[in-house]
């Protein structure tokens, strides 16, 4: 995972005002080493989630689907199949601290179906409880 792109996505997740809660996610589509589109999780529903949600109750927009949707405004589906997707999750630690740690951002089954269907080359995600040094994201 490219550390610069990862840090951009972590900042995007932290700044996401569309969700309130213990965790936030952001995803990025990377084409030829460049971040070309991003997406964040949202409480807003979206028609794409009816197709790619993991079940019929999973209607809220996932970061991966949002990033794919935004990428398809810029590139063709054929070009998308040459892209990577990066997914980051940040969460508050279990100890009640106000900082952020990385969380497991492995795509759900619905998002993984979308990633596979659109032919994305590689998938990168953050792992659980990796301390984000002392950086404060507000």
Residue ranges: model-predicted function:
Residues 1-24:
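Short, basic/aromatic recognition patches
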Residues 1-9, 35-46:
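Short, charge-rich amphipathic segments
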Residues 6, 21-23, 28, 69, ...:
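Functionally constrained cores in energy, signaling, and assembly domains
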Residues 21-38, 124:
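Short beta-strand scaffold segments in enzyme catalytic cores
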Residues 38-138:
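Zn2+-dependent cytidine deaminase-like catalytic core
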């Amino acid at each position: 995972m490219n550390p610069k792109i990862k840090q951009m996505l972590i900042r995007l997740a932290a700044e996401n005002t569309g969700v309130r809660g213990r965790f936030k996610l952001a995803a990025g589509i990377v084409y030829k080493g460049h971040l070309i589109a991003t997406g964040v999780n949202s409480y807003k529903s979206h028609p794409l989630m009816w197709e790619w949600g993991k079940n019929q109750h999973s209607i809220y927009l996932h970061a991966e689907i949002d990033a794919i949707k935004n990428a398809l405004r810029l590139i063709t589906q054929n070009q998308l199949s040459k892209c990577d997707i990066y997914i980051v999750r940040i969460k508050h630690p279990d100890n009640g601290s106000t900082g952020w740690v990385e969380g497991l951002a492995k795509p759900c089954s619905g998002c993984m179906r979308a990633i596979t269907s659109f032919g994305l080359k590689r998938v990168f995600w953050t792992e659980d409880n990796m301390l984000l040094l002392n950086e404060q994201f507000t």
